[in-house]
Amino acid sequence: MAKLALIEREKKRAKLAAKFAPKRAALKAIIDDQEKSEEERYMARLELQQLPRNANPTRQRNRCAITGRPRGTFRKFGLARNKIREIAFKGEIPGLTKASW
């Protein structure tokens, strides 16, 4: 199990990214717009740099909702492969069965 501080840090990053998402999108639209003047685009770049570093969604790491494990996490379930296996064998995930051919 991952340390609780790491799990909480990821939650904080996700919350911060969600908070600044509209502002980041607006600034990036200005930066990408070729119709805008160079100075406007430059100022938008500077403003984007002033945003908190953890507001960038690429700094987020997918973690298991139960254990906090950072690797082997399935996006569809939000769980690590180990926990998916345990829960699937118990029959707690509807429609998920072990493959056999």
From Swiss-Prot:
Keywords, in A-Z order: Ribonucleoprotein, Ribosomal protein, RNA-binding, rRNA-binding
A GO cellular component entry from the record: small ribosomal subunit
InterPro entries, sorted: Ribosomal_uS14, Ribosomal_uS14_bac/plastid
Pfam families for this protein: Ribosomal_S14 (PF00253)
GO annotation terms (biological process): translation
GO MF: rRNA binding; structural constituent of ribosome
UniProt key word rRNA-binding: yes
Domain of life: Bacteria
Oligomeric and partner information: Part of the 30S ribosomal subunit. Contacts proteins S3 and S10.
HAMAP family membership: Ribosomal_uS14_1
Family note: Belongs to the universal ribosomal protein uS14 family.
Function (record text): Binds 16S rRNA, required for the assembly of 30S particles and may also be responsible for determining the conformation of the 16S rRNA at the A site.
Protein name: Small ribosomal subunit protein uS14
